């Protein structure tokens, strides 16, 4: 299983930026579109309290929104 999950919707511009950010840095990730996966949508609300996307999970850490500083910190912690 991928260490990085990016929860998205098809119309989310910040989700596209997050995916591009990981691709540019050659960080493998798995995209989970919550429009097609209602269980994943419920999971992010349960874990983060937020219904919006992007939500990024790196290892066991959840990041709400496209926050480069938090993403870089977690990627460094995981040596990705």
Feature locations, PLM:
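Nucleotide phosphate-binding site architecture
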Residues: 13, 35, 72
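Residues that scaffold the ATP/ADP-binding catalytic core of kinase and kinase-like folds
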Residues: 15, 66, 74
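Thiol-based oxidoreductase modules, predominantly thioredoxin-like and allied folds used
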Residues: 27-40
